[in-house]
Each structure stands twice: as C-alpha cells, then as structure tokens.
Amino acid sequence: TANSFRVLKESGNETKICAFLWSYYGYSTSCYEGINVEVMRYRNGKIMAQNDKENNIAQDIDYVSGVPDSGTPHAIGYANESGIQFARPFIKYTPTWARSFTPSNQS
C-alpha cells in the first residue's frame, strides 16, 4: 500500500557480484569483493592463454589485441602468458563519454 511495504523475500547474506562488472562494465580502478577489475582482466587473459596452450588452440598467430577499453587488459594478460606479442590495432577515441552508450541528454 502507499503507507507500508511487505518483504516478499529476505535478502541473502552472501554478496554475489555479476561477472560482467569484472569483464566489461567495471572501471579499471574499481574493486569488487576485494579484487581490482584490472587485475581480474589480466588474470582472465592469462587463463585464456593457458587454456589455448593446453588445447593447442591459436598458437600460430602474429599478435594479440583487445577491443578498447575493457578488452585491452584481457589481451595484455593473454600476451604476457602466451609470449605472443601484444599490439594495439584499435584505439578508442572518447573525449567526453566514458562508455559506448548513447547519452540520454542528446540535443
């Protein structure tokens, strides 16, 4: 009603962070559950490289790159672990908008 509320389900005691924050949406300087976003992205790249090496996938490539901004640390982690050179063929130009979303206040 307008003057009260009813709890349908009590909140849990455990925090569950969406993996999308670590892999894409979270800023590099942010930390979730005590883990820095940039560090997690490097780790993800490292794990991908280890997986590819174990399965003999993508070993005959010239360089590793990521799509800016969030993909770059993944690629650096991959390159560092695999020994394959990192390169930046894509450079994102963002003079005013922090993310690739269309601003709601367009004029």
Label every PLM stretch briefly:
Residues T1-S107:
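PRPP-associated nucleotide enzymes
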